[in-house]
């Protein structure tokens, strides 16, 4: 059985690291959207799961509890979509070497 070439392995690791940095930069620019209440609350989140925008229909501002519930629902929807997109992009680069969920846990640190 032939021993793996350590130099080749290090080169592959460096290439994967560079690709991951590119993916993280791309994810900062990737925007997903969520909405609730038939569009009364709309949010945008980037691929690093940072809230970018929040729009609330002024007609619902009198009902504080409803606004709070709709904001939570819209934000959670956008974050879920962002997480799905992020995992897909990371999986493309990782090629089975690493678990995308592990990377996502550490992205905000």
UniProtKB/Swiss-Prot annotation:
Entry protein name: Nucleoid-associated protein Cvib_1034
Gene Ontology CC terms: bacterial nucleoid; cytosol
Gene3D superfamilies the UniProt entry points to: Nucleoid-associated protein YbaB-like domain
Entry's family note: Belongs to the YbaB/EbfC family.
Domain of life: Bacteria
Taxonomic source organism: Chlorobium phaeovibrioides (strain DSM 265 / 1930)
Functional description taken from the UniProt entry: Binds to DNA and alters its conformation. May be involved in regulation of gene expression, nucleoid organization and DNA protection.
Keyword Cytoplasm appears in the UniProt entry: yes
């Amino acid at each position: 059985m032939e021993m793996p070439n350590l130099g080749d392995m290090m080169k592959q690791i460096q290439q994967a690291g560079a690709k991951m940095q590119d993916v993280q930069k791309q994810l900062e620019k990737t925007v997903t959207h969520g909405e609730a209440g038939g569009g009364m609350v709309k949010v945008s989140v980037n691929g690093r799961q940072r809230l970018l925008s929040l729009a609330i229909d002024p007609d619902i501002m009198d009902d504080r509890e409803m606004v709070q519930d709709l904001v939570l629902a819209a934000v959670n929807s956008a974050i879920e979509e962002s997480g799905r997109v992020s995992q897909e992009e990371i999986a493309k680069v990782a090629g089975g070497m690493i678990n995308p969920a592990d990377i996502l846990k550490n992205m905000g640190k």
